[in-house]
């Protein structure tokens, strides 16, 4: 028996984005189904332009529902209510109005939801695939590929996601017991800085505290057009990624220590065995985003730390952790024993990270890149001063 399937469009007042999203949904391969539920969930923006469009729109793949609100809900409250559609439908795909999907979206979403339905370590399924480090946006994110089509990341997703009741209900229960976001210096600092209107930081926090992961495709079936809206004053292309087209059958990895798995800092997990260490005594900080207050006895990093360096690796293979896994000697990645202090100075080696990430040793290019980094940093400082 086929599971019921709903697509929830999270709408406000951007009619152009809705039309673009619908044009992509019309081209999705629904495997011959004509019972795909399309839900327009429209927050109150003081205008009925989206509602009027939704009423006239003809959805060719099944029933259409329109939900409106008498009062403004705000993004956080609105999306949390959309998640509750998992009480009515077996599988729910949630899409904001600046998202665009590929024709493989349904087949991936359905197969993934079915495969991981009873896996308690999975909190949700992402349609999107990061190509940049979500904590250092100028760095690339390159997960190790394998025979399967997906990997695990301890980061929730809002740029195209799949929920089921078994995944959503535990999160809502946790949220009811944790309604306030308390800042913590052990979590990614971006979460502490996101506005109160963010629902995603709560879902991320849930994954971190409960040790749960999202399933991510290596090649995305959704992309983010980043239209101007509540969180951005202008349209940008920074979040656009390549899309998978024409794929009909996906292979999914079982959740285990042998799977490709990354934590909330986008650092590879379970590297201890390659270093002769227990994972419980190893902190991986290749990208320089892990707070040093979370360091365990051994730290694997590109930075220079004031501790005894017990091993060194090169930075040649991709992804970076593969140099450690294959034992490539060098001088760029260091393993430190924090129980043995040394009279050395800490040195941030972000320049090396960026050189590796942009795949260039051209110092003129790197100089321009450094200027851009400084410009962004000063921009952030100005914004904080204004606040």
Where do the PLM segments sit?
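Peripheral/terminal regions associated with large enzymatic or DNA-binding modules
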Residues: 1-95, 99-387
């Amino acid at each position: 028996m086929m599971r019921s399937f709903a697509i929830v469009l999270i709408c406000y007042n951007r009619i152009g984005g809705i039309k673009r999203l619908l044009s992509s949904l019309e081209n999705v391969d629904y495997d011959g189904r004509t019972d795909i539920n399309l839900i327009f969930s429209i927050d109150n923006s003081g205008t009925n332009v989206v509602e009027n469009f939704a009423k006239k729109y003809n959805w060719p793949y099944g029933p259409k529902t329109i939900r409106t609100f008498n009062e403004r809900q705000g993004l956080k409250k609105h999306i949390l209510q959309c998640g509750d559609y998992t009480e009515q439908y077996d599988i729910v795909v949630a899409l904001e109005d600046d998202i665009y999907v590929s024709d493989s979206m349904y087949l991936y979403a359905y197969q993934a939801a079915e495969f991981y339905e009873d896996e308690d370590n999975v909190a949700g399924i992402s349609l999107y695939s990061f190509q940049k480090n979500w904590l250092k946006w100028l760095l690339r994110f390159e997960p190790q590929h394998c025979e399967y089509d997906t990997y695990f990341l301890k980061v929730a997703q809002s740029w195209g996601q799949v929920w089921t009741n078994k995944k959503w209900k535990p999160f809502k229960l946790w949220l009811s017991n944790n309604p306030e976001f308390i800042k913590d210096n052990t979590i990614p600092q971006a979460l502490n800085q996101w506005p109160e209107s963010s629902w995603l930081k709560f879902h991320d926090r849930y994954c971190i505290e409960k040790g749960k992961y999202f399933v991510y495709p290596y090649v995305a079936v959704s992309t983010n057009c980043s239209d101007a809206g509540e969180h951005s004053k202008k349209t940008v292309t920074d979040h656009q990624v390549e899309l998978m087209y024409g794929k009909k059958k996906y292979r999914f990895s079982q959740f285990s220590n042998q799977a490709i798995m990354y934590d909330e800092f986008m650092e590879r997990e379970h590297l201890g065995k390659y270093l002769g260490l227990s994972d419980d005594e190893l902190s991986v900080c290749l990208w320089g985003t892990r707070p040093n207050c979370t360091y365990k006895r051994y730290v694997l990093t590109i930075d220079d730390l004031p501790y005894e360096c017990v091993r060194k690796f090169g930075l040649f293979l991709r992804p970076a952790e593969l140099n450690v896994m294959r034992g490539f000697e060098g001088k760029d990645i260091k393993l430190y024993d924090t129980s043995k202090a040394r009279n050395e100075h800490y040195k941030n080696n972000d320049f090396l990270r960026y050189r590796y990430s942009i795949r260039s040793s051209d110092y003129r290019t790197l100089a321009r890149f450094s200027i851009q980094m400084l410009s962004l940093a000063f921009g952030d400082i100005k914004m904080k001063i204004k606040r």
